[in-house]
Regions:
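Short, Lys/Arg-enriched N-terminal segments with co-localized hydrophobic residues
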Residues: 3-19
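Long, hydrophobic N-terminal alpha-helical segment
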Residues: 17-67
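Conserved active-site and cofactor/substrate-binding residues in soluble primary-metabolism enzymes
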Residues: 21, 25-29, 38, 69-76, ...
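Short coil/turn connectors at secondary-structure junctions
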Residues: 38-41, 59-60, 87, 131-133, ...
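Short, solvent-exposed amphipathic alpha-helical segments in soluble enzyme
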Residues: 49-54, 59-62, 82, 108-109, ...
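A phosphate-binding glycine/aspartate-rich beta-alpha loop in the early core of alpha/beta enzymes
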Residues: 55-89
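Glycine-rich, aromatic-bearing surface loops/beta-hairpins
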Residues: 94, 99-158
Length: 158
């Protein structure tokens, strides 16, 4: 599957005037990581404060979209990822006071039918560091506790 994503990327680079994918997701490294991930793999969308170099699986592919503060946002990334893959579950880093972070409302809107599972900060770090985490996307999101860990689901047969 990774070879297919690489072929598409290579083909796209050769013929830039043609849009090859119908999806909103066009980033070649993210496409390759998702294609290689499969059912049960995890994707971390990290805010601008998340220590993604030290608190994520060492073998996970890292994509840095944190061009500037606020760009690209965690919700922009989640919207595109959620449209591209089936999502089985979602975990969030819960603030120390136990309340929901304001961004959780937006996460719920983007993931209808899923319950956000809150994890204490260090439990979230531990879960993000398991070998099943195949992709870490560092965003420029400035809102705190805007980290979400997605588990890739399955597409049922027709």
């Amino acid at each position: 599957v990774w070879c297919t994503a690489y072929f598409l990327f290579d083909f796209y680079c050769d013929f830039e005037e043609k849009l090859l994918l119908k999806s909103q997701l066009l980033h070649p490294e993210i496409l390759a990581a998702l294609a290689g991930g499969g059912h049960g793999a995890q994707v971390l969308i990290a805010d601008g404060n998340y220590p993604s170099s030290t608190h994520a699986a060492p073998n996970a592919r890292r994509v840095y979209l944190n061009l500037a503060p606020g760009t690209v946002s965690a919700t922009e990334v989640l919207r595109v990822i959620a449209a591209a893959i089936p999502i089985e579950s979602a975990q969030v880093m819960q603030p120390a006071d136990g309340r929901d972070a304001p961004i959780f409302t937006e996460f719920r809107t983007l993931l209808p039918g899923l319950t956000l599972e809150p994890l204490e900060r260090f439990a979230f770090y531990a879960q993000s560091s398991v070998p099943e985490t195949c992709l870490v996307i560092a965003t420029g999101e400035q809102r705190i506790y805007a980290n979400i860990l997605l588990t890739i689901g399955v597409i049922p047969p027709p």
